[in-house]
Amino acid sequence: MADELGTTEREIIAQRLKKAEALRALGVNPFGNGWQPRHLADELLRHYGDQPAEEIAKDPGDWSLAGRVLAVRSFGKAAFLRVRDRSAELQVWVKKDRVGEQAFEVFKLLDIGDIVGAEGPATRTKTGELTLEARTFTILTKATRPLPEKWHGLTDVEQRYRQRYVDLVVTPGVREAFVKRARIVSGIRRFLDARGYLEVETPTLHKPEEAGGAAARPFETHHNALDLDLKLRIATELHLKRLVVGGLDRVYEIGRIWRNEGIDRRHNPEFTSIEFYQAYATHEDLMRLTEELMHRLAVEVTGGPVVTFQGQAIDLTPPFPRVSMLEVGARALGLSPDDALAGRGLAEALSRAAARENDSEDAWKLEQAAKKTPGEAVALAFEIFGEPQLPKDRPAFVVDFPLETSPLSRRRDADPRLVDRFELFAAGMELANAFSELNDPADQRARFEAQMRAKAAGDEEAMPYDEDFVRALEHGMPPTAGEGIGIDRLAMLFTDSASIRDVILFPLLKSRD
């Protein structure tokens, strides 16, 4: 195996291409097929555990593994390889007198990053490391471009995201984070399936009047054959509720959502959500279900109910505390909840709050809130002043949402100024949004009309008027509660990832100039 240090990448690639030709000369296809491992590295490691060499020698087995070479220590006629498959890393010992002259000639053409196959018994070396002692050895795939093995992973964060295929190989913990993400999704599926929910698929391309379900700006496209303007969905909500009207009392969808908005450590324009709807349930029922789901996922994915996020321990043991948006938002403005919702003294309170706000963007938002409804102003005050004060060591349900913030939520019977809604926050992030669904078609029509007025006044995130959805409600939707959970942020929490890009395999990035 040649030393590649000190040469340019172009020279290394040229060297490796020559080695690929040398493999062909030996009768080995450097990009062959048909060699299948019978075992995983983790199986061998678990089988022998901490058994001493003497015990392993009594039953060394016949193991067959394949994986990528991460490191090589060569000693003339023998070498130790670090090989990783999808389960674990394992040391492989290649000796000329064990694998034979032909196979050792193949080995000498090996480079870090190559994918190899090896068969042989298990042993424990003098240094105490559990090892596969190769009886047969071959190169299955020649890597013609080198891995950045000189460094402990990629040092350029942008390069990590652009070349995730390399990041997964060389950066510690990345593979494990995405394995956890997959376990989160499968855990949610098991949880809902066990409770009688039906998984469905709804359209991702919406006609302009259907592109609702959230306050967000959609991406737009055009269908050439139908000469039809379309929008990528910003939520699955309205189609899922149509299914509840049709008698599918418990439905859910895990799917991609697109929102034409900014990018930061918690937002990506393309993300994954789970939305589920249950007839004959209230938002209170979903609070209890959410507590149970979060606790179970924490145990299944991390091994216990307490997770650590950026140095902060967060206990997901139910019940979760509740925080009133109305109470906190109004008090932050120096008003009583009743005065705030009635708009009494609200403009002056917003002006005072803006004057003392250090963040210029938040100050501008507070000034502009005087043009919005009182409920929207209270919600903004909570976002700016209340969210940073939410519990750090526990998730929390935010409740008592003003009516104007929730065009699809059911009014609260005891106080029609509010809606039956909650949001779940943890680690400073909104993880879930849920409410008892509005099923009064006349009320829904009126709220859509209010949204259209807001859109005409310049609100690009206002929802369109979906006449077909109102028609569906006129056929009768049973009392229903629904919830949406952001899979990506949930993965951030359970993998201790500071950026949403760390839990999306291929996040959207700017084009390189």
Curated annotation (Swiss-Prot):
Mg(2+) 1 binds at E423, E430. Binds 3 Mg(2+) ions per subunit. Keywords: Aminoacyl-tRNA synthetase, ATP-binding, Cytoplasm, Ligase, Magnesium, Metal-binding, Nucleotide-binding, Protein biosynthesis. Homodimer. GO terms for molecular function: ATP binding; lysine-tRNA ligase activity; magnesium ion binding; tRNA binding. It is found in: Cytoplasm. This is Lysine--tRNA ligase. Gene3D superfamilies: Bira Bifunctional Protein, Domain 2, Nucleic acid-binding proteins. GO terms for biological process: lysyl-tRNA aminoacylation. It comes from the Bacteria. Its cofactor is Mg(2+). The gene is lysS. Mg(2+) 2 binds at E430. The lineage of its organism: Bacteria, Pseudomonadati, Myxococcota, Myxococcia, Myxococcales. One of its GO terms (cellular component) is cytosol. The keyword Protein biosynthesis applies. Its main location: cytoplasm. Its EC number is 6.1.1.6. It catalyses: tRNA(Lys) + L-lysine + ATP = L-lysyl-tRNA(Lys) + AMP + diphosphate.
